[in-house]
Design a protein with these regions (language model features):
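Histidine-acidic metal/acid-base catalytic patches
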Residues: 2-37, 46-60, 162, 166-180, ...
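Hydrophobic alpha-helical segments, especially transmembrane helices
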Residues: 9-10, 27, 42, 86, ...
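Active-site acidic/histidine proton-transfer and metal-coordination neighborhood
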Residues: 15, 51-54, 87, 91-177, ...
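A short alpha-helix capping/helix-coil boundary motif
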Residues: 31-34, 61-66, 90-95, 115-118, ...
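Hydrophobic faces of well-ordered beta-strands that scaffold small-molecule active sites
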Residues: 36-41, 65-67, 95-100, 125-127, ...
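Active-site beta-loop-alpha junctions enriched in small/polar residues
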Residues: 41-45, 68-72, 100-103, 130, ...
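A conditional alpha-helix N-cap/helix-loop micro-motif detector
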Residues: 46, 77, 106-107, 130, ...
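Glycine-rich, proline-tolerant flexible connector loops at the mouths of alpha/beta enzymes
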Residues: 66-83
Length: 277
C-alpha cells in the first residue's frame, strides 16, 4: 500500500470519527421536549357553532381547547356531557380548562360546577370568585382535586394586578391559583414575564393575548405585535415550572366573524416561541 493511500485512509477514518463525535454532541445538546401544550380559548371562535369551532381548532393544529360557558354550558345532564366529550375525542382534542365561571357563597351552586367539571374531565376551572366563596372552594378543590384559577379582567376588575390575585389565594389551598390573562395584565400596566414569576407555584392557566398599548382602552393585536414578548413568556413559563396539564391557551378577541387567518398567525408565533424556549 502506498504511503499516500495509507495517509488518505487515516485521514478519512479520523474525519469519520470526528463527524460521529459531532453528531453525538448534537444529540446530547438537543433540548428535551417542553412540558407545554398549546391550546385555544374557544371564546376566540365564538362566531361559530361548537362543532365548527372544534373543527377550526383541529385545523389550526391544536390538541387542547379551553371552553367558555357559552359554548359548553354548565349542566348535570350526563348525556350532554358525554356527547361533548365524544365531539372532542372524534377530533383528537382534549379539554384543558373551563371558564370564566363565577363562584359565590352558594356552596350548592359551587358544588354543581365542580361536579360538572369532574364529569367533563376538566382539571382547571378559570374563575372570578367572590371573596366570600373561598371557604367553599377550599373544601371543593380538596374533594374533587380540581384547580380553581382566578382570571384577571383588567383595570376595572377586582382582580386587576398580579398582587391582587396573589393576595386572594395565598392563604388558601394550593390548588387555588391563577389563570393569568396576559393581555389584560398588559392593559393593567404589568409586564407578562414579571406576572409569571410573581405567580410562580400558583399558575395553572395562561391566556396568550396581546394589546397594542399598556392602557385600559386599547386594541387587540396578533401575538407579538404589541407588548407580549412571546419567546420571553415561554421561557418564563418553563422557568417557573408551569404544569404540563396547565391550560396554555391562545385567546384572540378581534374579528370574531372571521378570525381564522389571524389565529393562524398567532399559532405560528406561539409555536416558534415554544421551539426557541
Amino acid at each position: 500500500m502506498s504511503q499516500s493511500v495509507a495517509s488518505r485512509r487515516t485521514f478519512l477514518a479520523a474525519s469519520a470519527a470526528a463527524c460521529g463525535s459531532a453528531a453525538l454532541a448534537r444529540v446530547a445538546a438537543a433540548k428535551p421536549p417542553l412540558p407545554l401544550t398549546l391550546g385555544i380559548q374557544l371564546y376566540s371562535l365564538r362566531g361559530f357553532p361548537v362543532d365548527q369551532a372544534l373543527d377550526h381548532a383541529k385545523a389550526l393544529g391544536l390538541t387542547q381547547v379551553e371552553f367558555y360557558p357559552g359554548m359548553f354550558p354548565i349542566t348535570d345532564d350526563a348525556a350532554a356531557i358525554v356527547a361533548m366529550k365524544q365531539k372532542l375525542a372524534d377530533r383528537g382534542l382534549t379539554i384543558s380548562a373551563h371558564g370564566v365561571n363565577r363562584f359565590t357563597n352558594d356552596a350548592a351552586a359551587n358544588r354543581k360546577l365542580f361536579a360538572f367539571a369532574k364529569a367533563a374531565g376538566v382539571k382547571t376551572i378559570a374563575a372570578d370568585p367572590d371573596p366570600d366563596s373561598f371557604a367553599s372552594l377550599d373544601e371543593l378543590v380538596k374533594e374533587f382535586d380540581i384547580r380553581v384559577a382566578i382570571h384577571n379582567h383588567g383595570p376595572t376588575h377586582r382582580y386587576n394586578k398580579a398582587l391582587d390575585v396573589l393576595g386572594a389565594v395565598e392563604k388558601h389551598d394550593q390548588r387555588i391559583g391563577a389563570c393569568a390573562d396576559l393581555g389584560h395584565f398588559i392593559r393593567s400596566g404589568e409586564r407578562p414575564t414579571e406576572v409569571i414569576r410573581l405567580l410562580e407555584g400558583r399558575l395553572y392557566g395562561i391566556h396568550l393575548k396581546d394589546f397594542a398599548e399598556m392602557q385600559d382602552k386599547t386594541k387587540g393585536v396578533i401575538l407579538g405585535q404589541g407588548h407580549l414578548d412571546v419567546p420571553a413568556v415561554m421561557e418564563a413559563l418553563v422557568a417557573v415550572g408551569f404544569p404540563a396539564d396547565g391550560a396554555l391557551s391562545i385567546e384572540y378577541e378581534e374579528n370574531p366573524k372571521d378570525p381564522i387567518a389571524d389565529l393562524e398567525e398567532c399559532v405560528a408565533v406561539a409555536r416558534q416561541a415554544l421551539n426557541q424556549a
